[in-house]
Amino acid sequence: MIPRIRQSQRDLIDVSNITDANSLLIYNTDEDCYNYYSKTEQEWQSLCGKLGKADFTIEDCSRIRVNGVYQNNVALTSANYLTIPVNVTKVGSYSIQVVPNPANGYYFSTSGEFLSTGTFEITVPGSGTPVNYTPTGSDGDEIKITLNGIDLDCSNKPKIKIEDTTKRPRFAISCNSVTVHGVYKKGIATTTANKITMRLNVYDGSQGATYSVKTDMIDGLSFSGSGVLGAAGTQEIVLYAEGTPYSTSSKLFTITTNSESTTATCQALVVPVISKKKIMAAGSTTYGLTSGGENGCDAMIKNIMNYGDNENSIIKYEGFASVETSSSLSDLATWVGGTQPYDIIVITYNLTPNDAQRALLVDYVNKGGVLIYLDQNNSGTDGTRNVQLVGEIFGESIDRPVDIASTCNYVIKMNPGVDDEISNGPFGDVRNGQWGEDYNNSCGLPVVPRGAIVYAGAINASTGLASTSGAQATILRHPTKNFFWCGDSGLIHGGTSTSNTTTPFQIGSRTFNGVTYPKYPVDKQAYGNQAAANRLPVCNSTLFANVMAWAIKMAEESGINSGK
């Protein structure tokens, strides 16, 4: 008689003498299969296959997903399947069967081999035709799960609702009611807080029918919801998120339904939170990225309603709480080098890079680094170096800075012909506005580099006339590299001053759709050195808020550390 033993008992058999052990035969009760010892392989082999049966389980049955619509007297198709997460601790063959309990004319089944251990999601296709629909008040068919012939005992198993085919789902979807809720982070599993709410318009005669509404899957994330249609009229429903986002890119989902009266779809945009970036703010703290205290740029960028992981944050980002500062460029080689260089470098007053530093910055930008360069030096060696950096990033030679002086009355017209995420971005549209010079010593470029996106030339916004200085550009960026330049080191100089010729950066409280943003960028009013009646609002803070949103996005998607 062939001995029937467990695998642990089999492994205690002395097989050190492979000649004597060769061809030993046992029945492995764990695998439910015959095993024999092979002298050639010097290991136990299974007659059920070289790998034998796998050891695996479902650790959380609540994560089993039921896909598709199920109707009585309607055969299952390829759209009807289960997605089951399993944890494999031993490679080998597997079989999975899922049946309704009690039986109802359909089932799910699959088999195969696990070639490595770890966690996997298995798709288990359905077959058959449901016989009985789910009665009113019931959650659906209970299921029994069998893994390699052994019934699995687990709680929180999903139930499968079978629609009554005599009740037809006829309804329309209201796209303007679609609202995305929750915070989405790369690598973090979604919870019940992650959902989409929307309204249905239920038609007469559909009460009691089952609705099914879902999205496509993008980057590991999808939404779905189902339920029973109520009386004719408006009905709010919830689509809960499933899965874990595996990228920070924005995701535009298409919402589809099982309505028999329309094939219309809606869309829902999900914007995941971008991870924190290494940021260096170089220059005077009076004029730089962290200037202005509670009334300036520092407060604007660090407020989580502007840039944060709040559900209502304008930019979904882990925040600027850890911005580093430096009053010199002496450590620039360290900032741009190594295995983890700074993602974003912001240079303001009064730090014009020397020749060696310029070469480092050009290389940094060419490798994907984000450089925001605000420099008003317009004469002498530093003036030349200022515009040389711009030229070299564009692959051109520019060595003559232009002094704007007071030729624009401190208010320079924005370019209305440029429409992108900086000129018309998440914090507002500045295309028909003007930016304010901080004092009257801005630098302009004598030429526009090839391909440059010019946000502002040198047109006096109060008169509509071009500056007599001959400047052609005062604010621009590169079309493909992560580089932004402004010829005024005080572009983001802010605070509580009411001066009409300095501190053009201002923030205030704004409320949108019932949500308050206490440190929001706002125009500074009545700016410029012209007659009081002709002074204008300036958009410095809105412009720069959009610039920082662009910088974060570029650092994430095409930055120097992207993909690391």
Model-derived features: positions:
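Extracellular/surface-exposed low-complexity repeats and stalk/linker segments enriched in Gly/Pro
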Residues: 1-27
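Short, solvent-exposed loop/linker segments at beta-strand-coil boundaries, enriched for Pro/Gly
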Residues: 100-115, 215-229, 261-263
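Short, surface-exposed loop/turn segments at beta-strand-coil junctions that are enriched for proline
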Residues: 127-135, 242-248
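Aromatic-Pro/Gly-enriched surface loop or interdomain linker
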Residues: 272-344
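Extracellular ligand-binding/catalytic regions of CAZymes and related secreted enzymes
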Residues: 481-484, 488-564
